[in-house]
């Protein structure tokens, strides 16, 4: 029997559409034979889960061994005292997007997750020396060529 792959999802821009996309697709995602780890915060998911429809489907973890099937496992890699302002570009939202991407990438490089999905970020808001996800991953992984799949 094959083990279920562990899919890591970076949160993207906290004021962007990433968390909202995840919330709206939870039922389809959890029907798959996979384990999901969201790199962000419980605050972020509960904000976009407007009617608390999915609250019982979230599982806060501090270690990869705590993940549960049929849950969105949340690895908290963001500060809890931030404001969510949908549609606004703020310094925090850019920093949070980078922190989430970096944390998720480290988990992938350490073999703790099998697949990495990156939610959208505002490139002009991420004050880092890379153009976007693809270039960041290329440099972080130390490779010269890369390929993006949509």
Predicted segments — roles?
Residues 1-150:
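Anion-binding alpha/beta catalytic cores of soluble intermediary-metabolism enzymes, centered on
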